[in-house]
């Protein structure tokens, strides 16, 4: 029997069981838990390699073979960190297993035929496309920035750079919902729209859901009163959609206790639950300990650094239409920015009390940094808090699974789309991101949308090969023409499907129906289920979770930063 060194094997086919991989320049390492390969039967494409006619490629017709195979990929997902070949058929993940030619190779369940394309993923990491659940649709160019960062699904609201959209994630009313659904039909990213949830009577909310809103957003700038909260959640329970909330910073219509009383035991997604992005001052963070509250963060406070507080004051004045010459407006801004709660937020993420991360795109958040900042928090918390049980000093698999769930499966489950997107699992849309380990979470090697490459770094178009400088991200064929419609999904509620809204608006994209929103609870948040008793000192803003004081120093240096962004 022939032998090969572990290093030579990893160089040729990627890491296998027991090998460890560093994630970019972070302090995080993953260890391969399982390898679906049969040693000696690995498939690889190229001159003199395995995937050739009669060898690793069989004779089957297209109906029996994969449309696309990613070979020897290191999959990092909430369910595991494994090495496998990934088979894609009709734009969906068909098989995770062993690729090759079943006529001559044993154990093949990912058949390769003459109709199969190949992406060489050996030495690469594959993750699910990110789900950003806090999008202000201020400009369509956000889609390019998000795709280039590894995000493939948007949940949010807006109508463009209108004053209301600059501040709130709402697409208000049937007319605007129709126009935004039609506009989204040509954007190469999955989209679900949130309507405006601020109403004390239900009819105007019901008509927005029937018009295509997959959720409703309660925002203090429209008046997040107990009456509006109760009414909105009542309609959500009736029509199985999610409610997201930005609570009352000024405590005008009530305090955190009043909001929690209005919510009752009904499921709700609390945006920027720390509070710098808005919410009851100073203690909205307490909501993260409730069983029915699904808490998320927006990325400007992630992680806590020496620059976080100063940056936030200016952002807030612009986004919420405040006037620095008005003392009350300045006081409003300053009440939201608290070092103590921002520092506690990182720790609560590491404990699994905060379940999701998101952007707050162009409205106190950066649409292209959801993935990057999530992993910066994970790195920073490893330095501050050490390994998370059951991790060891040598691998961080559990912490990695906890953090990747925050921007993939958990927002998908929260908004009732987890059956379509949010993980690398059979049956789901093939929205996949390939990373070189050295560039993990910073710059994808390529992004697949519905099984087709939608964006990738590309060199000089007049070059003799694809790699000469200048290399930058460019739209690929999956972003063009009718291919967009075959590889992207618009999400609609059942009420809109029942009235035939997709046909009425002549939507050409795939349609996904949200469901199960009202059943999701904190224990359903994958790897992020903790429900601590959170207390905030009203004078000092110190935060305690189950009696433990949550404090950490701001970071002065981070990974995934200037080393990767010289220009």
UniProtKB/Swiss-Prot annotation:
GO CC, one annotated term: cytoplasm
Cofactor(s) needed: Ni cation
CDD domains: Urease_alpha
SUPFAM superfamilies, A to Z: Composite domain of metallo-dependent hydrolases, Metallo-dependent hydrolases
Domain Urease residue range list: 129-567
Record PTM N6-carboxylysine, positions in chain: 217
The reaction(s) this protein catalyses: urea + 2 H2O + H(+) = hydrogencarbonate + 2 NH4(+)
UniProt keyword annotations, A-Z: Cytoplasm, Hydrolase, Metal-binding, Nickel
Residues binding substrate: 219
Residue sites binding Ni(2+) 1 per the record: 134, 136, 217, 360
Entry EC number(s): 3.5.1.5
BP GO annotations: urea catabolic process
InterPro entries tied to this protein: Amidohydro-rel (IPR006680), Metal-dep_hydrolase_composite (IPR011059), Metal_Hydrolase (IPR032466), Urease_alpha_N_dom (IPR011612), Urease_alpha_subunit (IPR050112), Urease_AS (IPR017950), Urease_asu (IPR005848), Urease_asu_c (IPR017951)
Subunit comment: Heterotrimer of UreA (gamma), UreB (beta) and UreC (alpha) subunits. Three heterotrimers associate to form the active enzyme.
Protein name: Urease subunit alpha
């Amino acid at each position: 029997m022939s032998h090969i060194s572990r290093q030579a094997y990893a160089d040729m086919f990627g890491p296998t069981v027991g090998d460890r991989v560093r994630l970019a320049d972070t302090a995080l390492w993953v260890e391969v838990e399982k390898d679906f390969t049969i040693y000696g039967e690995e498939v690889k494409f190229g001159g003199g390699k395995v995937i050739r006619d009669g060898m690793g490629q069989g004779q089957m017709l297209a109906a029996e073979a994969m449309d696309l195979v990613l070979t020897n990929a290191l999959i990092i997902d909430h369910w595991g960190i494994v090495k496998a070949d990934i088979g894609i058929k009709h734009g969906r993940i068909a098989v995770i297993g062993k690729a090759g030619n079943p006529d001559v190779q044993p154990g093949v369940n990912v058949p390769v035929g003459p109709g199969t394309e190949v992406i060489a993923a050996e030495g690469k990491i594959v993750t699910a496309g990110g789900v950003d659940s806090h999008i202000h649709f201020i400009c369509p160019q956000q889609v390019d920035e998000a795709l280039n960062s590894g995000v493939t699904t948007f949940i949010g609201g807006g109508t463009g750079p209108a004053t209301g959209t600059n501040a709130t994630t709402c697409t208000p009313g049937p007319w605007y919902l129709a126009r935004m659904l039609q506009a989204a039909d040509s954007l190469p990213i999955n989209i679900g729209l949130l309507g405006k949830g601020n109403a004390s009577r239900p009819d105007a909310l019901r008509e927005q859901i029937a018009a295509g809103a997959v959720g409703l957003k309660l925002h203090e700038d429209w008046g997040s009163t107990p009456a509006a909260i109760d009414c909105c959640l009542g309609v959500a329970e009736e029509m199985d959609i999610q409610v997201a909330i930005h609570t009352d910073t000024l405590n005008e219509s009530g305090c955190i206790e009043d909001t929690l009383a209005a919510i009752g035991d009904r499921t709700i997604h609390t945006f920027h639950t720390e509070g710098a992005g808005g919410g009851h001052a100073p203690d909205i963070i307490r909501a993260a300990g409730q069983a029915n509250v699904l808490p998320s963060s927006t990325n400007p406070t992630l992680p806590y650094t020496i620059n976080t507080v100063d940056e936030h004051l200016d952002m807030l004045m612009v986004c919420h239409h405040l006037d620095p010459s008005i003392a009350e407006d300045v006081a409003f801004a300053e009440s939201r920015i608290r070092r103590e709660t921002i520092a506690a937020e990182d720790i609560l993420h590491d404990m699994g009390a905060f379940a999701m991360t998101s952007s707050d795109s162009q409205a106190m958040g950066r649409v292209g940094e959801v993935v990057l900042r999530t992993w910066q928090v994970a790195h920073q918390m490893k330095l501050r808090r050490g390994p998370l049980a059951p991790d060891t000093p040598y691998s961080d698999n559990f912490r990695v699974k906890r953090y990747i769930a925050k921007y993939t499966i958990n927002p998908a489950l929260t908004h009732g789309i987890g059956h379509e997107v949010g993980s690398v699992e059979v049956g789901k849309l093939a929205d996949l991101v390939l990373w070189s380990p050295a560039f993990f979470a910073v710059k994808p090697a390529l992004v697949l949308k519905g099984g087709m490459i939608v964006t990738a770094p590309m060199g000089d178009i007049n070059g003799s090969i694809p790699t000469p400088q200048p290399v930058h991200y460019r739209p690929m064929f999956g972003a063009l023409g009718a291919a967009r419609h075959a590889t992207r999904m618009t999400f609609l509620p059942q009420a809109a499907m029942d009235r035939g809204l997709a046909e009425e608006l002549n939507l050409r994209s795939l349609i996904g129906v949200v469901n199960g929103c009202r059943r999701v609870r904190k224990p359903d948040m994958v790897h992020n289920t903790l429900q601590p008793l959170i207390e905030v000192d009203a004078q000092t803003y110190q935060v305690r979770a189950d009696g433990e004081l949550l404090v950490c120093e701001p970071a002065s240096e981070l990974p995934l930063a200037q080393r990767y962004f010289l220009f």
